[in-house]
Every structure is written in C-alpha cells, then in structure tokens.
C-alpha cells in the first residue's frame, strides 16, 4: 500500500505543512499540489466542495506526492467511508464532543474487527495499491475537531480513543458564543 507520508512524518516528530482547498476545482487542487505542501485538505464542511467535486480533486492530488485529506461535513459514517473509498488518506471530523462520538468516527474509518467500515475502495485500491485493505486501518489518519465546551471538558476521554491520531481545536466554537471573539 502507498505509505501515508504525513503519518510517517508525524511518527518521526517532523512538522507537517497542510494546505486547504475550499473551492471545487481540479485546477486549484493541481496548483496547490505543486506548491510544496505535505498534504492538502479538501473542505467538505465549510467549503463549496461536495463528493462529485472531491473525487476529481482527489484524482488530481493523487498524481503528486501530496497526501490527500478531507474534512467531512459531519460525523456521518456513510460520508466518511465513501470519501475514504475515493482515495482520501485521512479524515478531519467536525463536532466531536465526547468519547462515544470519537469512537463512532474512528470505527467508521476502520474495517472489521477494528471498526465497521464497509469494503468498497474502488479508487482506494487504484491509489493505495492492491494490499489496501490489509494496511488501510493503520495508514488512514483520523483527526477529531474539538469545537464545543463539552468537547473541551471531555478532551482527555476523547484523546483516549484507540485509533484517533490527533485533534484540531477550534477556539471560535469552544467559547459560549462565537461572538465572544468578535
């Protein structure tokens, strides 16, 4: 299986430089993929990108050595599994507020017996290689977004979830009101 470059960099303690794609365009994905980023995140939550746009963007990124990631719009297993099947090598999941939500997210990214991801990585096999299923659980990055007061209060239990690789903390939403930062 194609190695997840940024997962390796993280395990070696190296910094990772990640770009962000919110415009549904293969041209912008191609331009960004040739600018020296270690990874690019396709934003399916607050960007203008949906699955029909994300797939050709993933194909474009895959022609380079940049690791493709996606921020999904919700902790919805079907969407998570589908974008992984399309060749995404990591997921950023928004609005993870407790351990149960973190477990649901991580398990959607992993095949049985570690999770409940269904098997259908048509594009994942093309991009990742013929042994994709054997190594996918270990190679896929799983990041939870910490965006609520509840998630801050339960941060230790969220971080204890086996298979979770890291977190993104969004301070704007962890305050009682987003207006507090205005």
Regions found by a protein language model. Name each.
Residues 1-18, 130-136:
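N-terminal amphipathic alpha-helix/helix-capping segment at the start of soluble metabolic enzymes
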Residues 19, 43, 91, 105, ...:
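Conserved, mostly hydrophobic/aromatic
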Residues 22-33, 75-81, 151-159:
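Short, acidic/polar
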Residues 51-72:
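Alpha-helix-loop-beta-strand connector modules within alpha/beta enzyme cores
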Residues 66-90:
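Active-site beta->alpha loop and helix N-cap motifs at the rims of alpha/beta catalytic domains
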Residues 93-97, 165-172:
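Non-cysteine beta-strand/loop elements that form the S-adenosyl-L-methionine
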Residues 93-161:
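Conserved anion-binding
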Residues 173-182:
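Single conserved hydrophobic/aromatic residue that forms the stacking wall/gate
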């Amino acid at each position: 299986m194609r190695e997840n470059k940024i997962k390796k960099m993280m395990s070696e303690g190296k910094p990772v430089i990640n770009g962000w794609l919110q415009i549904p365009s293969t041209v912008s994905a191609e331009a960004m993929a040739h600018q020296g980023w270690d990874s690019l995140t396709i934003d399916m939550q607050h960007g203008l990108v949906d699955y029909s746009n994300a797939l050709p963007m993933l194909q474009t990124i895959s022609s380079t050595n940049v690791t493709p990631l996606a921020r999904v719009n919700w902790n919805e297993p079907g969407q998570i599994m589908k974008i992984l099947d399309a060749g995404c090598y990591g997921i950023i999941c928004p609005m993870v507020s407790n351990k149960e939500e973190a477990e649901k997210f991580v398990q959607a990214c992993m095949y049985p017996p570690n999770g409940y991801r269904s098997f259908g990585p048509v594009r994942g096999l093309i991009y990742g290689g013929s042994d994709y299923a054997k190594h996918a659980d270990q190679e896929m990055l799983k990041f939870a977004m910490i965006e609520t007061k509840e998630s801050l209060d339960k941060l230790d239990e969220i971080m204890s979830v086996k298979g979770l690789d890291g977190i993104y903390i969004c301070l704007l939403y962890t305050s009682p009101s987003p207006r507090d930062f205005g």
